């Protein structure tokens, strides 16, 4: 069992299989040309898998594959099958922008993927182009529909932005309800790579918009979940991730592994420790030592103060795996 210095059980590993992404979303990617880590610096699937096995053997129960955009890396469905084949009953999930999902969903399902979180910030093609800096909406919608039809557990992630999609939040919920997916509204999280003109909506503002159509009640959430959970009168549940006022640091159960092998204890933590050389040398003992050191270094609370003006990591979310 993996336990940090504050007695929190860590049983959730987020693995960024690549920092590359085919979108350049304004709330995530920098304006300047993207420079990735380089092929030689990225862990192979086999190297990632060997580290994942260490974690699974020590009590990790949930693996989420992220990016960048995980579906731009070739062979990711084979990687899913490797992980799924190692431990039965594993909660194996992926976060994706959905662009390539329609083509790859069946292979991912066959490989053992259970759940998919898909980004959808608007149902308007012009706005989608503005946010992602390319035409993406048709592909994303097709990906969502395919995933829902195949029986994946689907969540739709929507970053709530003032003067961008604030007039669509109800429409997006209705879309998610129709598809049988849960929507989660995400407060815009300031980071050094986001466009400076963006402004987000907070939880109260989001609820105020939704309540114009629906009666809402807050319900008990999982203690490890980053989102507040709400229910409509018809039983439909939706979430709001509101780190500005309600972090979940006291129950945080996760570590993050970047594509280049950096093991990171917190999304807003600048530093981590690299397992790359240990994994390439096949030095499992050394990898375990690094894992234990990162557990010991896991902070009690993130460095981002509740007013959003605290120290913000210069590591972009696309590098850490959001």
Swiss-Prot record:
Q: Which cofactor does it need?
A: [4Fe-4S] cluster
Pathway involvement of the protein, from the record = Cofactor biosynthesis; molybdopterin biosynthesis
Which free-text remark accompanies the cofactor? Binds 2 [4Fe-4S] clusters. Binds 1 [4Fe-4S] cluster coordinated with 3 cysteines and an exchangeable S-adenosyl-L-methionine and 1 [4Fe-4S] cluster coordinated with 3 cysteines and the GTP-derived substrate.
Which PROSITE patterns is this protein grouped with? Answer: MOAA_NIFB_PQQE (PS01305), RADICAL_SAM (PS51918)
Q: Check the record and name the CDD domains matching this protein.
A: Radical_SAM, Twitch_MoaA
Which EC class is the enzyme in?
A: lyase
Instruction: Report the domain of life of the source organism.
Output: Bacteria
Statement: the UniProt record of this protein carries the keyword Iron-sulfur: yes
Quaternary structure (record): Monomer and homodimer.
**What HAMAP family does UniProt report for this protein, alphabetically?**
MoaA_B
Annotated family: Belongs to the radical SAM superfamily. MoaA family.
Question: What is the protein name stated in its UniProt record?
Answer: GTP 3',8-cyclase
Organism for this UniProt entry: Campylobacter fetus subsp. fetus (strain 82-40)
Q: What is the lineage of its organism?
A: Bacteria, Pseudomonadati, Campylobacterota, Epsilonproteobacteria, Campylobacterales
């Amino acid at each position: 069992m993996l336990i940090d210095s504050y007695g929190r059980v860590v049983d959730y590993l987020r693995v960024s299989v690549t920092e590359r992404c085919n979108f350049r979303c304004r709330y995530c990617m920098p304006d300047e040309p993207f420079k990735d880590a380089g092929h030689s610096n990225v862990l192979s699937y086999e190297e990632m898998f060997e580290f994942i096995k260490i974690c699974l053997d020590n009590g990790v129960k949930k693996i989420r594959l992220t990016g960048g955009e995980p579906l731009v890396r070739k062979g990711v469905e084979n990687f899913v099958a490797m992980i799924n084949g190692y431990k039965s009953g594993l909660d194996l999930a992926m976060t994706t922008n959905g662009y390539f999902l329609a083509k790859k969903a069946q292979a991912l399902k066959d490989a053992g993927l259970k759940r998919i979180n898909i980004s959808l910030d608007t149902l308007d093609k012009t706005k989608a182009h503005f946010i992602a800096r390319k035409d993406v909406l048709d592909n994303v919608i097709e990906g969502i529909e395919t995933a829902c039809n195949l029986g994946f557990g689907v969540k739709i992630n929507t970053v709530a932005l003032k003067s961008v999609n604030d007039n669509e939040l109800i429409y997006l919920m209705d879309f998610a309800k129709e598809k049988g997916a849960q929507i989660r509204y995400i407060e815009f999280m300031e980071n050094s790579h986001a466009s400076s003109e963006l402004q987000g909506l907070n939880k109260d503002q989001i609820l105020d918009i939704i309540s114009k159509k629906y009666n809402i009640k807050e319900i008990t959430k999982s203690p490890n979940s980053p989102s507040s959970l709400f229910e409509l009168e018809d039983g439909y549940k939706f979430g709001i991730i509101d780190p500005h006022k309600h972090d979940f640091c006291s129950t945080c159960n996760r570590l993050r592994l970047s594509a280049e092998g950096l093991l990171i204890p917190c999304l807003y933590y600048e530093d981590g420790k690299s397992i790359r050389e240990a994994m390439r040398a096949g030095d499992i003992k050394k990898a375990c030592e690094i894992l234990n050191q990162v557990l010991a270094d896991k902070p009690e609370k993130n460095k981002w103060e509740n007013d959003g003006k605290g120290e913000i990591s210069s590591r972009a979310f696309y590098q850490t795996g959001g």
